[in-house]
Amino acid sequence: MMNMLYRYAIAALAMLLLSACADKVESLGIVPYPENVEIGCGSFDAFGARVIAEGLSAEEEDLVQGLGTLITAGSDGKVRSSKIVFSHIDGMDPEEYAIEIGSRRIEVYSSAYNGTLYAIATLKQLMPVEVYTGVYNPDSDWNIPCAVIKDKPRFAHRGMLLDCSRHFFEIDEVKKILDIMSVYKLNRFHWHLTDDHGWRMEIKKYPLLTEVGGWRNGTMVGWDAKSNDGIRYGGYYTQEQLRDVVAYAAQRGIEIVPEIDLPAHMVSALTAYPHLGCTGGPYSLMTVWDIAKDVLCVGKDSSFEFIEDVLTEVCEVFPYEYIHIGGDECPKIRWEKCPHCQARIKELGLKDSGKWTAEHYLQNYVTARVQKFLASKGRKVIGWDEILEGDLQPGATIMSWRGVQGGIEAANNGFDAIMTPCEYCYLNYCQSDKPELEPVGFHEYVPVEKCYGYEPLDGIPEDAHHHILGVQCNVWTEFIGTPAHVQYMLLPRMLAISEVQWSAPEDKDYDRFRADVMDHQFEILKSMGYTYCKEIEY
């Protein structure tokens, strides 16, 4: 009954707001743009408004109280008669919300924590930037246009990857990324924690992973692969720090997807424990941005014992459904010559198929074995699209990065997929077609408009659309060594990706988006202290 009354009230108010008036604004400036917006006449003065929570959870009440503190902080504690009232409505999706903005009262509806969180994120974008900084300007305009907003995301997975192996970023720097993700309603932080260039997660059973594998003897300079700055480089996160980040992210509606890349991209582990490799070493962490030939020896049972021990600790720290196991860029040259791996191939009866080698099927075996182990822990596997090569077992989720074809193939074969094609979603690529204007990095050109124009369901049959879980942008840090550089590459392109993730195609408009970013969102980014590319077109 309450749900029906809510929908009737929303419809009635929308009709009222649609009445013609001279002062109606064209856009609310919100990114990502909501599913349905009806802008009316007049405005609500939010300065000093009383913020009320009715029937919300304790965690949601904390969110609402936080908004109330921001609104009243600059008003000398004087609370006006105008109200912003938050309440629950049955039947709404967990990430759905609705906002009715009248001249004296705002009603906010949701059914769960994330819906309330996103409603607040939207309201804050309608207010002066003081709500992000806490530094108040008496001349700021706190008037919010009267409107009805009904909103929910298009995709469940709205992700962003940060590579902390190639370059290490301190906890506070990671949290600053989580903060800006929350502003734009991203909800999955893919944390790339291990690679050939450094192991970043404390594993208590294998302390050398961070003591040895967490540090490399220098880093190449620019594009010169023969160069080395000679500076010992590294760092790692303790499990206590990681748990703190998990809690911090959860408050912002973000789940963390940790990645332990295997069986390739493992030189940091091999350097610490050489017996895990096919040759026995010695190994050393890579100092150049390249793909290592050395990978885990999967003919040895000790390698699987290592994998299971590591993933057990990963599951203890990260409580969410998905664990990313990499699976990308795995050269087979060591396996081809390794007696242990060849014995495993013979034991399993693996054969070349003409399309795939026995070593490809050996990697399928690794994926399936790890998948089965994680299933025993109540977890699911995500892997890069290379895990499709050969004979993938049901239940894995594909992350399509080498273009869109991996996601299309996955969906057509009944696998879930997350779309992150490099030509649209790799934000370590240049924002300009003139690399000399950009920091040193990969020369591929991915401007804001290209990010914004990506349609993740193109090429996917309609009856397979449900297999596309969402979209993710990635920042790989081979050439990105500072927090400011990460932010510059991320912003404002992440805002464009956020509309791909959240907004339906019919609700997207690049001209509107560009104006909203230039006129309002840059002000938010600046107020929060982010470095960003100030021109979204060159």
Question: Where on the chain are the PLM-derived regions?
Answer:
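Flexible loop/turn segments at secondary-structure boundaries
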Residues: 60, 168-170, 196-202, 263-269, ...
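Feature activates predominantly on carbohydrate-active enzymes
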Residues: 22, 93-304, 308-322, 338, ...
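Soluble non-cytosolic domains of exported or imported proteins
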Residues: 58-62, 113-118, 168-172, 236, ...
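Active-site neighborhood of glycoside hydrolase catalytic domains
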Residues: 269-275, 286-394, 401-409
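Bacterial Sec-dependent N-terminal signal peptides
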Residues: 1-29
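Acidic, contiguous N-terminal accessory segments
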Residues: 21-156, 375-388, 392, 519-538
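Flexible, acidic glycine-rich loops studded with aromatic residues
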Residues: 380-396, 401-538
